[in-house]
Design a protein with these regions (language model features):
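Gram-negative bacterial Sec-dependent N-terminal signal peptides
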Residues: 4-24
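Gram-negative outer-membrane beta-barrel domains
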Residues: 21-189
Length: 189
């Protein structure tokens, strides 16, 4: 038994020594080189157009249809979980025409796409301050969108792996009472 132990003990140490490099390998990575698991803060600027259906309540208790261009920004955090991404975001926008201000919060879930892109769906709560005879309103907001990085659209090498991404999104306020398409530039870091 002692002879077996004297043989197994050095072999055990040898096995541990040989396995150590495999255990010390880098963590899992996404296709763009960022960690597959972690926390990714971001911020961005956006522009869009918000158009309310004339049959809506809230902003549209008066006759007519509220609508207006928007310019704003957003900030949030993504938490990649392998191919799935979950996160939270705050937004704010200055409106023109019938909308004075919009601001809100959303949570989102998405799937990584391409080298550095993401397809996502989101839901949250939005406050809208109207003007020109349209009142204020607050309600749920739902939407979906896509983000694409430089490599995904043929501009590889333009920014670093975690750099600027183009965002295309569409949202609806109070379950299909409005439509809000938007375009944004998102900076991940």
């Amino acid at each position: 038994m002692e002879k077996i132990m004297k043989t197994l003990l050095p072999l055990s140490f040898l096995a541990i020594a040989l396995a150590s490099p495999a255990l010390a390998q880098d963590e899992a990575r996404a296709p763009d080189g960022s960690p597959a698991f972690g926390v990714e803060p971001y911020f961005g600027v956006m522009g869009g157009y918000h158009d309310f259906d004339s049959g809506n309540h809230g902003l549209l208790q008066t006759n007519g249809s509220a609508h207006g261009w928007l310019a704003g920004g957003y900030a949030g955090v993504n938490m990649p979980l392998g191919p799935v991404v979950v996160g939270a975001e705050a937004n704010g926008a200055k409106g023109f025409q019938d909308i004075d201000w919009e601001y809100g919060v959303t949570g989102h879930v998405g799937l990584r796409a391409g080298d550095s892109g993401m397809i996502f769906a989101r839901a949250g709560y939005q406050w809208i301050e109207g003007k020109r005879g349209f009142g204020n309103d607050r309600n749920e907001i739902y939407g979906m969108g896509v983000e694409v990085g430089p490599k995904d659209i043929g501009l590889g090498g333009l920014t670093t792996n975690a750099g600027v991404r183009l965002r295309l999104a569409v949202d609806t306020f109070d379950v299909f009472q409005s439509i809000r398409p938007s375009v944004g530039l998102t900076m991940h870091f």
